[in-house]
């Protein structure tokens, strides 16, 4: 045990350059590398996401179907989008069409509620 204590004292007294040289000599002698092992991450399972998905912040409101009260839906579309009468009518009659893009969740829900009150079918994506 005295020899080990003596060895520890000798190693502790080495300079950084001497310690690096000792490390290289031991690597060559033992045929090993002092490089830190790199952990390989396991691949995610087939159905699992690699990282948690970010919560969506921008939504698109889509008019799926105008319903029976087309005139009321056209009026609401004009109010929501600022479109003219002809453009709003074309949007309603050409459903499914995008009403508004890049809106926050609250605004998308509000638009959906207003249009559904007029009998329209609305989707939020």
UniProtKB/Swiss-Prot annotation:
Function: Forms part of the ribosomal stalk which helps the ribosome interact with GTP-bound translation factors. Is thus essential for accurate translation.
One GO MF term: structural constituent of ribosome
Species of origin: Granulibacter bethesdensis (strain ATCC BAA-1260 / CGDNIH1)
The keyword Membrane is annotated on this UniProt entry: no
Disulfide bonds: none
Gene3D superfamilies: 3.30.1390.10, Single helix bin
A Pfam family matched in the record: Ribosomal_L12
Any single biological process term in GO: translation
Name assigned to this protein: Large ribosomal subunit protein bL12
Keyword Disulfide bond: no
Keywords: Ribonucleoprotein, Ribosomal protein
Quaternary structure annotation from Swiss-Prot or TrEMBL: Homodimer. Part of the ribosomal stalk of the 50S ribosomal subunit. Forms a multimeric L10(L12)X complex, where L10 forms an elongated spine to which 2 to 4 L12 dimers bind in a sequential fashion. Binds GTP-bound translation factors.
Stated family: Belongs to the bacterial ribosomal protein bL12 family.
Gene Ontology CC annotation, any one: cytosolic large ribosomal subunit
